């Protein structure tokens, strides 16, 4: 089976080497609600994604909500309207595997977040923050420098601003008329793709257990419109045949089952690679901000001056 991924490994080994230094293991912060703000239906459990951390939040008692900003109409081969319906259905099924409570769709046009006024998208995210009162916001790293996907860039930027501004009463004061009060979010986790370039770096790893990795794998497989589809296995077989290669484990399997096996292997592999960077079995890496990261030097000041109450 591993021969299938030689070409993938050649690319990803470069990614792993970019982060060769061990990262510290982070503990989950205190809280009850995590709001996952993403552009697309599948960004929670892509190969570089956050499904393991979401599953761990749920395991530790958090309520988790998923926001997809776009309608995902371009993701798949069934035409815009049907792609939208299939991808929403698969997103609901996948997030249930992770234990999430709800999928909230903003339904902006897929691959069209550039023309959207940033303050309009930001206002929607602020409204959701004020409605669901998250302790933690999770999404793409808004400060990563090598993000090719425009929806990822734009939604991440809106997320970063909403995370900061949702606590200010003078920002979107119209929300008060529908009973939504300002709400401060203390913790932010940002996820970046390091295989696209050496950009903004993660500063912690979050350890995952076997069950959380398995949930991530199952959620990833659920997105068969774009990931674990028969077409991906057929394309791989054609590419290997050109090199006079094949995968013995695929003999007797349908293209669908072969695709699922391939995705299972890769999701376990990437979680293991991340774990190796922190000296544990499985992990995911993130750029993390906590309640003391707002001002430069604040942590050093607190470290020098804090005293425990008697």
Regions found by a protein language model. Give the residues of each.
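Short, well-ordered beta-to-alpha junction loops that form the rim of enzyme active sites
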Residues: 108, 139-142, 192-193
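Active-site adenylate/phosphate-handling loop in enzymes that bind or generate adenylated species
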Residues: 130-174
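Short, low-complexity, charge-dense intrinsically disordered segments
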Residues: 1-13
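Stable alpha-helical elements in mature extracytoplasmic
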Residues: 50, 87, 121, 125, ...
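Acidic beta-to-alpha connecting loop that harbors the catalytic carboxylate
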Residues: 41, 143, 223
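C-terminal accessory domains and tails appended to enzymatic cores
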Residues: 21, 30-31, 168-184, 191-310
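Active-site rim/loop-helix segments in enzyme catalytic domains that contact anionic ligands
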Residues: 18-131, 161, 168
């Amino acid at each position: 089976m591993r021969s299938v991924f030689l070409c993938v490994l050649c690319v990803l080994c470069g990614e792993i080497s970019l982060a060769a230094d061990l990262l510290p293991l982070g503990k989950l912060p205190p809280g009850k609600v995590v709001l996952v703000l993403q552009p697309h239906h599948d960004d929670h459990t892509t190969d570089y994604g956050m499904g393991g951390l979401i599953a761990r939040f749920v395991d530790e008692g958090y309520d988790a909500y998923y926001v997809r900003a776009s309608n995902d109409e371009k993701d798949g081969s069934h035409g815009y309207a049907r792609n939208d319906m299939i991808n929403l259905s698969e997103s609901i099924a996948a997030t249930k595997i992770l234990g999430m409570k709800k999928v909230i769709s903003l339904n902006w046009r897929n691959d069209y977040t550039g023309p959207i006024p940033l303050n309009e998208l930001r206002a929607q995210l602020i409204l959701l923050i004020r409605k669901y009162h998250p302790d933690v916001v999770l999404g793409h790293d808004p400060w990563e420098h090598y993000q090719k996907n425009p929806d990822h860039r734009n939604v991440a930027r809106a997320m970063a601003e909403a995370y900061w501004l949702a606590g200010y009463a003078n920002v979107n004061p119209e929300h008060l008329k529908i009973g939504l009060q300002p709400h401060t979010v203390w913790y932010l986790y940002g996820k970046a793709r390091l295989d696209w370039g050496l950009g903004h770096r993660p500063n912690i790893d979050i350890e995952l257990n076997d069950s959380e990795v398995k949930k991530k794998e199952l959620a990833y497989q659920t997105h068969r419109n774009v990931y674990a589809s028969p077409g991906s296995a057929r394309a791989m077989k054609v590419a290997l045949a050109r090199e006079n290669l094949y995968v013995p484990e695929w003999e007797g399997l349908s293209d669908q089952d072969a695709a699922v096996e391939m995705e299972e292997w890769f999701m376990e592999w990437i979680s293991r690679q991340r774990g190796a960077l922190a000296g544990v079995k499985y992990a995911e890496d993130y750029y993390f901000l906590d309640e003391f990261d707002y001002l430069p030097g604040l942590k050093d000041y607190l470290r020098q001056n804090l005293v425990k109450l008697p």
